[in-house]
Amino acid sequence: MTIMARARGRRSSVQASDWETVVHQSFALRARGFVFLLAALLAGLVPGSALLKAQEAPTAVIHIGLILPTAGTTPLQAAIAKSAADGMTYAEDDFQLNAELVGIDFKIVKETASGAAAVTAAADKLVAAGAFGVMGGFNYAEAKALGDWSKAKNVPFINLAASSDLLRNQQCTPTMFHMAPSAAMYMDALAGWYVRSNLRQWYIVYEDTDEGRAQYERFRASIRDRHFGAREVGATRLAVGASGGTSLVSAVRRANADAIFLLMGAEGQLRILAELDKGGITAQTTGFPYPETQLREFYEMSAKAAPTLGVGHCAAAWEGTIDAYGAREWNARYSSLFNEPLQMPAWSIYHAVKTFYESAVFGGGDTSAANIIAHMTNQDNVFDLHKGLGSTFRPWDRQLRQSLYLVKINANPKDRISGAILVGELPAIYMPGTELVERLDQLGDMQRQTKCK
């Protein structure tokens, strides 16, 4: 049940004046969302006289498919699933209210599935239920499977959380778009932040997988080509699930590194952090920002596993304490509703819904694949991500341009909200003499580098 549905169910227990106050407050918090609805009215999608009959005769059908992750078997998987479900409810509340005002038949059609085979079966069910586009992908395998599925079925797909550069290059498809920042974007941002702090000598620990090796090569290119004086002073390749042990500790110490980068999943990062911390390593250490590592639950685990190294800096697609660009109210309302900070999975789902919804509304209610894809790839169409800069999808790999955040893990938080401290943003919002796209394209692979065909 949506938030608004629960509110409607309680309406009889409050006074009319109280209800009006609630509605006015809700409208104020949603003010940014009404811009595209006004545009729809002006464009003739919903004639003004039709507003009085909005509930009787929907003027457009906008049904969006969402594949939620299962709760899994670990606390981090459960946290991802909860954030995703809450993000869906948050988006459903906002856009259902907006749609009702102009007579749009709006619905988020959902399935819950994890794993490549399961998510493609779920995607088929969503389309059969009337969804014109599908959102999903909480890891590389799922996003790869859904990208291939979307191409075969000619259904627009938004990748919510998988960062692999392979999906934006050799494995790209014309129907797959990326809400999640790419690995290249994350790594360029981290390199920029650390090098600007005069941490230039890097030791890299990476997993022996296709994705791990690709991340390693891309990060080496970032520090070599973009940052004068930065260099790799050592590297260790580990099998998935393997420990580094005393040999890794000795290698890092001999390398005299300023910074250590762990290119592996959440469990691997926690394991290596603990080993290095126990071995007395003090170099600044960070890990690749997979979705699981952008959660308050991970920050708490990191601080516990490695009291010295585990309270360092991390990159994030979103941070629940951002208080600029309209994000303050947006974050605060989410926290008041769910008693949680707004985290990456919820952020990604909300804005993927918003992207599909706006593309359909601005397209006159035409939800054909050709129309939706044309709107999303049009460089004149800007999407607001609550990040202060209007965003567009890069035409060469359909990656959404956006800024990223640097947070520091709080070793002694007083509550979940304060579990992370926002300390930086890249690219800088205000850079005189530069264009918007130029600023955002500081992060990630440019057209000359793409292998997307």
Q: What are these model-predicted stretches?
A:
Residues T2-R11, S17-E20, H24-F27, F34-L41, ...:
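Extracytosolic ligand-binding ectodomains
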